[in-house]
Amino acid sequence: MKCCQAAAVAAVGAPKARMAGFYGAVGRRHVNLHRKYEVQQENMRFGMVNETILAIIIAFAISAALCPVVIPFLHRLKFGQQVRDDGPQSHLKKQGTPTMGGLIILTAIVITSLFYIRSYPRIIPILFVTVGFGIIGFLDDYIKIVMKRSEGLNPIQKLIGQFVITGIFTYYLMTSGEVGTEMLIPFTGGFENGYYLNLGWLFVPAVFFIVLGTDNGVNFTDGLDGLCTSVTILVATFFTVVAIGEDSGISPITGAVVGSLLGFLLFNVYPAKVFMGDTGSLALGGFVASSAFMMQMPIFIAVVGLIYLVEVLSVIIQVTYFKKTGGKRFFKMAPIHHHFELCGWSETRVVAVFSIVTAILCLVAYMGL
């Protein structure tokens, strides 16, 4: 009897043991697959880091190598900066310093990006906006410097060009299926758990407002030796770190901008041997705005690009106050970096403080992801 009971128990227990073994094997297989996926992701991210570092190095080398060649060439062509008579007196010695150095920055960015464009197709829209706005800046510089028309492109001409490029970029954002109309709200939990602002069709005017506002902000920031270059290096570095972490597929071009600006800064730092001109500043404004939109982060521009925002707001406040009060000035001079100069700050101090503020804001923004 006991033998029969033991046999029965063994017969019942055998399937359970087999089932336990089966589920155990499935569990181990699931864990192994998950681990394999994690390893693949780590390898991909490691590869992306290496490719981005290489992009920085290539762009830096191109930019640093071109500057000693292009700067004397700009000198010979007499492509010199025209300095305002009503500006800080310390700026009068800058008269004739070669400008249109943005051509160096753009060349380094474009050449570097071409190495990655097949593997990273998402850099194409950013490259389009950056180069497009750079062309507008080049035409503006060319008219002012070569054709000796101090006004450059008139506001309507410049606005038409910016509207066309921004319109094409907006169409891509809304129809490509890769970006959409959502914007990540800072400090709400990051890309996975955060809140997104969906504007629907209001997204269209929002893109125009943010892109053109950012572009003008970067343009106004380019008023001191190394200022726009230093601030934008930090902003581009922020986007590069986020792009790698989120695998957004744009890190090669953000890295290329970092590298090209580092190479350019060697010759743009005080006392500057070359200025980027509107060719560079408008291109960089387009880069900052388009990169932010490609990662659904345009709201973050108000944090990492606060200096740009303050610069453009200072001009708006100055002009409005001047008109309302019949000629009185709110600031000693606008954009605001000139106000600090007239308050007694040295040019290098303004650049250092603005750069430190930007670095801190980039860290704060990263904490908000």
Language model region names:
Residues C3-C4:
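Cysteine-centered motifs
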Residues V146, E178-G194:
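Membrane-interface helix termini and inter-helical loops of multi-pass transporters
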Residues R122-N154, K158-Q162:
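Hydrophobic alpha-helical hairpins/lids featuring a short glycine-rich hinge
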Residues G24, V31, R35-E38:
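Short hydrophobic alpha-helical segments enriched in small aliphatic residues
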